[in-house]
């Protein structure tokens, strides 16, 4: 039995549908992300689990117990929001101890638990500081420590990094995942940032318009997207429109502007001859050669734009009436291309994904 289960969960706000017929199973100790654009229903789903929002239909179970109609305080769930909610009139110690004081634990036990939580989040020595004396990342650590110290069954994180700058977000991604691994707590993470989900998650549920479109590991979601929407939403994508010529098992031959290429069909997709299909190839999977190269070409193209980004050089290549973006590592031996150079665009056979 899964540790957390959503069974047929829907949430309607009047005539507006926020979540529709949601089924999810999350294992104990798993880092599970709900990923999708704004308004897709991911935060509503999280708040239904926390008890702040009541489902219109369906049931939610935690460790075999139906919690659908329980108030938040009866669910043993901790939640961290993006705005931290640190009490400005309290010290770091007092903020972290707040939940323990409410539970009327002995003073010595409170100090022991708070000291342990401070050490866990790397904030030992900050006990007497106030909110105004903390950076954004430090505030987020305090908010997380305040939740972890009460030892909840489940940790919910609702876009906790969105208020931080890029450098701090990168640091906090790895820090949160390390903390989760260390504590072993079942964690459900809400984000619209695919990088956060790919970096930290054991599994991801991609949502749109109140529905789950695909559930899988980060590798499965990135390399085997179930739809064009997911291919576009997760990472950067080259999407080439074509027509299925032949299907042999999981391999689909595709006509793209008069050139035949192949793509692999993902597990849940099928195609038939003559059907319109989209070929997905990630920018980092594509290779370029000048037209006199010996490798067999996949598509012929012309360099239309060159973007220098330090560690990589990006080329926008026109192939027929479509374009692909190619990302090349910037090495000392890199053979630079110029605008309007004619090139061959190719990739490994298993790097192209056919999406009906």
Outline where the language-model segments fall.
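ABC ATPase nucleotide-binding domains
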Residues: 31, 72-78, 82-229
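Conserved ABC transporter NBD signature motif
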Residues: 58-66
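Non-catalytic connector elements of ABC transporters
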Residues: 237, 247-356
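Conserved coupling/switch loops of ABC nucleotide-binding domains, chiefly the family-specific signature
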Residues: 56-59, 109, 209, 241
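The feature captures the beta-strand-to-loop junction immediately N-terminal to the Walker
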Residues: 35-37
């Amino acid at each position: 039995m899964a540790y957390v289960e959503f069974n047929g969960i829907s949430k309607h706000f009047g005539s507006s549908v926020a979540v529709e017929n949601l089924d999810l199973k999350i294992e104990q100790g798993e880092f599970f992300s709900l990923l999708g654009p704004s308004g897709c229903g991911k935060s509503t789903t999280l708040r239904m689990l926390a008890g702040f929002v009541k489902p219109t239909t369906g049931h939610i179970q935690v460790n075999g117990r139906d919690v659908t109609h329980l108030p938040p305080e009866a669910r043993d769930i901790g939640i961290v929001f993006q705005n931290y909610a640190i009490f400005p009139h309290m010290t770091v110690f007092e903020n972290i101890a707040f939940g323990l004081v409410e539970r009327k634990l002995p003073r010595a036990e409170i100090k022991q638990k708070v000291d342990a939580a401070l050490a866990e989040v790397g904030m030992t020595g900050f006990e007497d500081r106030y909110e105004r004396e903390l950076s954004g990342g430090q505030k987020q650590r305090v908010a997380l420590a305040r939740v972890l110290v009460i030892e909840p069954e489940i940790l919910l994180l609702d876009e906790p990094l969105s208020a931080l700058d890029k450098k701090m977000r990168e640091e906090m991604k790895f820090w949160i995942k390390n903390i989760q691994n260390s504590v072993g707590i079942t964690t459900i993470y809400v984000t619209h940032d695919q990088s956060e989900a790919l970096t930290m998650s054991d599994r991801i549920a991609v949502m749109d318009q109140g529905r789950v479109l695909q559930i899988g590991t980060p590798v499965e979601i990135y390399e085997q997207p179930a739809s064009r929407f997911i291919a576009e939403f997760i990472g950067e994508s080259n999407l080439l429109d074509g027509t299925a010529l032949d299907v042999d098992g999981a391999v689909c031959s595709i006509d793209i502007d008069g050139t035949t290429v192949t793509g692999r069909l993902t597990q849940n997709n099928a195609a038939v001859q003559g059907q319109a299909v989209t070929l997905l190839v990630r920018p980092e999977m594509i290779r370029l050669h000048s037209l006199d190269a010996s490798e067999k070409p996949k598509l012929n193209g012309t360099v239309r734009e060159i973007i220098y980004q330090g560690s990589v050089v990006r080329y926008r290549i026109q192939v027929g009436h479509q374009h692909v973006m190619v990302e090349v590592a910037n090495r000392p031996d890199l053979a630079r291309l110029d605008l309007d150079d004619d090139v061959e665009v190719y990739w490994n056979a298993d790097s192209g994904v056919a999406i009906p």
